[in-house]
Structure formats: C-alpha cells, structure tokens
C-alpha cells in the first residue's frame, strides 16, 4: 500500500521541494554524506517503507525508531509521506522551522532525529544489508 502511494506520488510529478519524504531524503543526504535514497532505501529490516523483525545493526535501529515516530504521527492524523516542512542546516545543526502546522513541525523532528542517528552510526553501515531480503527479517518487531 505504501509503495503504491509512493509510486503514485512520483508519477504525479512531485518536485524535489514537495513532500516530507523528499525532505527526509535531503536531510539524511546532507547529514551523512550518503545519497539517502540509494544508501538507505531499503536497508536492513527497517530502513525504507515499513519494517518488521529485529533490526540488524545500529543503522537499522535508527530506522526502526523513525518508523515508530511516523506511526505516532499517523495516529494523530499526520501524512508523513506528503506533509512538507521547512528546515535549515547550519554548521551541521538541523533547525526545524517554528512555522507550519503541528504535524509539519513534528514530522521535521522525526526526520531530524533519524538523520542525526544515521550520522552518529555511520560506522555501523554494512553494504551487505543494502537491499536486504525482507523475508529474512525474523523475530519480534520491537515495540514503539
């Protein structure tokens, strides 16, 4: 379902300045130096849309926590893939704008948290977990 939504959004011609998913991509790319879409989507059992099972490493744990953050926002009616927000990065510090809706500010906070987590855990990044086969993700998914 989420993949179909993402494909639909991309086919609809969303530009690089629209939507939370694209903000997330730019924020992670800036903080990690890795092209987020190509390095983290998918990665392990939790990076990318959805996630299940035990996270494979510290990088994957960042994504699992991010999934939980988005899940809480969804309960509150936020649209994590399409809500747009404003932010800036100065000297390696992400500053979410105080402008925008509550959902937009919270979405920025979720994305900021994962971008910083991924940066702090760059040493755990394992290329073998890139395109990890999700059916191999076993065990109980950590609770949010």
UniProtKB/Swiss-Prot annotation:
PROSITE patterns: PA2_ASP, PA2_HIS
Induction: Up-regulated in thymus upon endotoxin challenge. Up-regulated during Treg differention in response to TGFB1. Up-regulated in pulmonary ITGAX/CD11C-positive dendritic cell subset upon chronic oxidative stress associated with aging.
Family: Belongs to the phospholipase A2 family.
GO biological process, one term: lipid catabolic process
A GO CC annotation given for this chain: extracellular region
Tissue expression from the record: Highly expressed in secondary lymphoid tissues, spleen and lymph nodes. Expressed at a lesser extent in thymus. Expressed in CD4-positive, IL2RA/CD25-positive, FOXP3-positive Tregs (at protein level). Expressed in myeloid cell subsets resident in spleen and lymph nodes, ITGAX/CD11C-positive dendritic cells and macrophages (at protein level). Enriched in CD4-positive, ITGAM/CD11B-positive dendritic cell subset. Expressed in pulmonary ITGAX/CD11C-positive dendritic cell subset (at protein level).
Protein name as it appears in the record: Group IID secretory phospholipase A2
Positions annotated to bind Ca(2+): 46, 48, 50, 67
Gene, per the UniProt record: Pla2g2d
Annotated signal sequence range: 1-19
Keywords: Calcium, Cell membrane, Cytoplasm, Disulfide bond, Glycoprotein, Hydrolase, Inflammatory response, Lipid metabolism, Membrane, Metal-binding, Phospholipid metabolism, Secreted, Signal
Glycosylation-annotated residues: 99
Record flagged with keyword Cytoplasm: yes
Cofactor, free-text remark: Binds 1 Ca(2+) ion per subunit.
List of catalytic residues: 66, 111
Disulfide bonds: 45-137, 47-63, 62-117, 68-144, 69-110, 78-103, 96-108
SMART domains membership: PA2c (SM00085)
Source organism (scientific name): Mus musculus (Mouse)
Catalytic activity: a 1,2-diacyl-sn-glycero-3-phosphoethanolamine + H2O = a 1-acyl-sn-glycero-3-phosphoethanolamine + a fatty acid + H(+); 1-hexadecanoyl-2-(9Z-octadecenoyl)-sn-glycero-3-phosphoethanolamine + H2O = 1-hexadecanoyl-sn-glycero-3-phosphoethanolamine + (9Z)-octadecenoate + H(+); 1-hexadecanoyl-2-(9Z,12Z-octadecadienoyl)-sn-glycero-3-phosphoethanolamine + H2O = 1-hexadecanoyl-sn-glycero-3-phosphoethanolamine + (9Z,12Z)-octadecadienoate + H(+); 1,2-dihexadecanoyl-sn-glycero-3-phospho-(1'-sn-glycerol) + H2O = 1-hexadecanoyl-sn-glycero-3-phospho-(1'-sn-glycerol) + hexadecanoate + H(+)
Function comment: Secretory calcium-dependent phospholipase A2 that primarily targets extracellular lipids, exerting anti-inflammatory and immunosuppressive functions. Hydrolyzes the ester bond of the fatty acyl group attached at sn-2 position of phospholipids (phospholipase A2 activity) with preference for phosphatidylethanolamines and phosphatidylglycerols over phosphatidylcholines.
Keyword Disulfide bond found: yes
Cofactor(s) in the UniProt record: Ca(2+)
Annotated GO MF terms: calcium ion binding; calcium-dependent phospholipase A2 activity; heparan sulfate proteoglycan binding; heparin binding
Enzyme Commission code: 3.1.1.4
KO phenotype (gene knockout): Knockout mice are born at the expected Mendelian rate and have normal embryonic and postnatal development. They are susceptible to acute and chronic inflammatory reactions and resistant to tumorigenesis. In a model of hapten-induced contact hypersensitivity, mutant mice show an enhanced T-helper 1 immune response in skin lymph nodes at sensitization phase followed by delayed inflammation resolution with more severe ear swelling, epidermal hyperplasia, and inflammatory cell infiltration at elicitation phase.
